[in-house]
């Protein structure tokens, strides 16, 4: 009873803090000169990380096994992983706008985990025989950590694409306006004034565009490194899962839905890393591959749980509304 109450308190505290954090991040992003809300939001994210750590520890003690046996526990661990990835850059770069993106996905995952949709699996259960193995910690934790890193890195790539295509759109719009001015043959002075005004607004070297260019470089830099880390975790997770499968079922690979989608995920991000070796494909081109990977990961993570089939169906669930 005490553990259940403590778990309930930590869950709601962590969700409340992360809700406040994302609000502060949005304020900081809109007003770039505001420093205090940013510092407060980062401290709040650290507090969220500590609450989630306490929640997982409490559930581990209460259930008697590592809390990765069902969808609810994996979502909490995924939120914990997101918050960990969020706070690591904070100690390296005290002021980093990229954390707004990672905070957003943290609150989304935490919100879904604590929502009424998963009420039936909030309570700890006895581990099924197939999961009673030391490989549970190694395999599942590596897979969830890889999902967290790959999702964060892919989300940064999505943001890079949005900003890049938005800049292209406004740039082409400005060029069309210049051509329109030329076609109507305005007076030379009027045309030059109009052209100078447009250049002042759209020049790449203006303060606003310079900030965007720097932000795009940061997105590209961090997305590549976070995805690389996630790819390593994914590789370790797949290999450890193959060893565990051989011990449990007598075969390293059986092509069940989870294994198939994990392999597809691995292939997609292997292609992404390959594109990074070609300078002509870096930036927006590789970001398109990462964006595809973002969708593939969610299919891999939720697909089997929604279908409830295959050898990995232990964490399947049914949506319930209360």
UniProtKB/Swiss-Prot annotation:
Its main localization is plastid
* GO BP: cytochrome complex assembly
Q: Which GO terms describe its molecular function?
A: heme binding
The subcellular location is:
Plastid, Chloroplast thylakoid membrane
Which UniProt keywords are present, listed alphabetically? Chloroplast, Cytochrome c-type biogenesis, Membrane, Plastid, Thylakoid, Transmembrane, Transmembrane helix
Q: Which Pfam families match?
A: Cytochrom_C_asm (PF01578)
- Bilayer disposition of the protein: Multi-pass membrane protein
Keyword set includes Thylakoid: yes
Q: Which residues cross the membrane?
A: 9-29, 44-64, 71-91, 98-118, 143-163, 226-246, 253-273, 287-307
Subunit (UniProt): May interact with Ccs1.
Role according to the record: Required during biogenesis of c-type cytochromes (cytochrome c6 and cytochrome f) at the step of heme attachment.
Give the record's family classification: Belongs to the CcmF/CycK/Ccl1/NrfE/CcsA family.
Name of the featured protein: Cytochrome c biogenesis protein CcsA
Record lineage: Eukaryota, Viridiplantae, Streptophyta, Embryophyta, Tracheophyta
């Amino acid at each position: 009873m005490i553990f259940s109450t403590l778990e309930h308190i930590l869950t709601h505290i962590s969700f409340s803090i992360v809700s406040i954090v994302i609000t502060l991040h949005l304020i900081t992003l809109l007003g770039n000169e505001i420093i205090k809300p940013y510092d407060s939001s980062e401290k709040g994210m650290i507090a969220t990380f500590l609450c989630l750590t306490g929640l997982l520890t409490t559930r581990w003690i209460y259930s008697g096994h590592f809390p990765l046996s069902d969808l609810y526990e994996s979502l909490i661990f995924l939120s914990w992983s997101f918050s960990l990835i969020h706070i690591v850059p904070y100690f390296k770069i005290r002021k980093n706008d990229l954390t707004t993106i990672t905070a957003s996905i943290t609150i989304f995952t935490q919100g879904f985990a604590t929502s009424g949709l998963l009420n039936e699996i909030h309570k700890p259960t006895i581990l099924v025989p197939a999961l009673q193995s030391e490989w549970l910690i190694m395999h599942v934790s590596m897979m969830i950590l890889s999902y967290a890193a790959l999702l964060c890195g892919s989300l940064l790539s999505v943001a890079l694409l949005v900003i890049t295509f938005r800049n292209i759109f406004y740039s082409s719009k400005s060029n069309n306006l210049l051509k329109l001015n030329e076609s109507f043959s305005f007076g030379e002075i009027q045309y030059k004034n109009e052209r100078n005004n447009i250049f002042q607004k759209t020049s790449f070297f203006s303060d606003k565009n310079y900030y965007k260019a720097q932000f795009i470089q940061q997105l590209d830099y961090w997305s590549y490194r976070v995805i690389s880390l996630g790819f390593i975790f994914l590789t370790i997770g797949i290999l450890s899962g193959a060893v565990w499968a051989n011990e449990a079922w007598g075969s390293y690979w059986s092509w069940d839905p989870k294994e198939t989608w994990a392999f597809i995920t691995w292939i997609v991000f292997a292609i992404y890393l390959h594109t990074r070796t070609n300078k002509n494909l870096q930036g927006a081109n590789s970001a398109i591959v990462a964006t595809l990977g973002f969708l593939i990961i969610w299919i891999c993570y939720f697909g089997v749980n929604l279908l409830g089939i295959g050898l990995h169906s232990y964490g399947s669930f049914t949506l319930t509304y209360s």
